[in-house]
Amino acid sequence: MKISPTKFLLSRRNAMAISMIEPRSAWYDIINEQGKKTKTLSQNIGEIVGYGPHFFIVRRSVWYDLYDESGKKYKTLSENIGIVTSVTGETFVVRRSAWLDTYDRFGKKINTRSAR
C-alpha cells in the first residue's frame, strides 16, 4: 500500500514528534516529545535500526519497514538497497558497496555519493 506524501502529511497533523523509542521486555514503547507513551508495538515487528522525529526504520528479515510516529507501517524496502547507517531528521543514509545513498522519510532516494 502506497501513501502519497500529501495524504501522509495531512494524516499526521495532530501527531507529535518521536522523542525516543524504548525497548521493554518484548515491546517497543514510542515516546513523544512531551515524554508520553503514544504507542506500544511488539518486538515481533523486527529490529529498530534508527528513528527520526517523524518516522522510524525496522529491519525485518530481508526487508526494511518504514513506520510513522503513530506506529503505522507505510513503506517496505528490500535490504538490497544496502545497510542503514544513520537516521537524521527527515532522511536516512544507506551504505551500498562504495556508495552512500540518502533517502527521504518516504523511502525515495534523493542523493548518491561516494563513501570514499
Place the predicted regions along the sequence by residue.
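Surface-exposed loop/turn elements that mediate protein-protein interactions on large endomembrane-trafficking
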Residues: I3, S25-Q43, Y64-E79, T102-S114
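Residue-identity detector for glycine
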Residues: R12, G35, G46, G50-G52, ...
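Short beta-strand elements that form the blades of beta-propeller/WD-repeat-like
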Residues: F8-L10, N14-P23, G52-R59, T85-R96, ...
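Residue-level detector of conserved, function-critical positions
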Residues: L41-Y51, F55-I57, T76-V87, V93, ...
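Charged, amphipathic alpha-helical segments
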Residues: K2-A17, L41, I45, V49
